[in-house]
């Protein structure tokens, strides 16, 4: 049962063109202020698949202490509750809606 749920989650997070377009709109409304060239947050270009807390940014200790990469599951968990995923993180904005998180992740996967 857990494998089926995981497969459904993975498939739901795939970057389809429509999902990415919705994700871009959500990103522009919710994320771009800090992650669109501002020093407030790191650039998210290439974030999907990248090692967590890697790149030219002063990441929080909470994120630096996380092992692994930004998989769909990790991005989903972080967007759902940044402070639960990485206690001490600087990011306080969360995305409660599952579909919105999936759309944002789909868009993030298009950023290179």
Outline where the language-model segments fall.
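Bacterial N-terminal signal peptides that target proteins for export
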Residues: 1-6
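N-terminal signal peptide c-region/cleavage motif recognized by signal peptidases
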Residues: 10-18
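Sequence/structural segment immediately N-terminal to covalent heme-attachment motifs in c-type
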Residues: 20-41
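Extracytoplasmic copper-binding redox domains, predominantly the cupredoxin/blue-copper superfamily
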Residues: 26, 54-56, 107
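Short cysteine/histidine-rich zinc-coordinating motifs and their immediately flanking basic loops
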Residues: 41-47
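Axial heme c-ligation environment in periplasmic c-type cytochrome domains
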Residues: 42, 56-105
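Hydrophobic aliphatic residues
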Residues: 48-51, 79, 108
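Short, solvent-exposed mixed-charge patches
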Residues: 111-112
């Amino acid at each position: 049962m857990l494998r089926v749920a995981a497969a459904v989650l993975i498939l739901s997070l795939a970057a389809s063109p429509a999902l990415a377009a919705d994700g871009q709109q959500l990103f522009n409304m919710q994320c771009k202020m800090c992650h669109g060239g501002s020093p407030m947050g790191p650039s998210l270009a290439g974030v999907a698949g990248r090692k967590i807390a890697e790149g030219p940014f002063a990441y929080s200790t909470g994120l630096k202490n996380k092992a692994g990469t930004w998989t769909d599951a990790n991005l989903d968990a972080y967007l759902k509750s940044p402070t639960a995923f990485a206690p001490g993180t600087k990011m306080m904005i969360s995305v409660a809606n599952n579909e919105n998180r999936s759309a944002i992740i789909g868009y993030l996967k298009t950023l290179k």
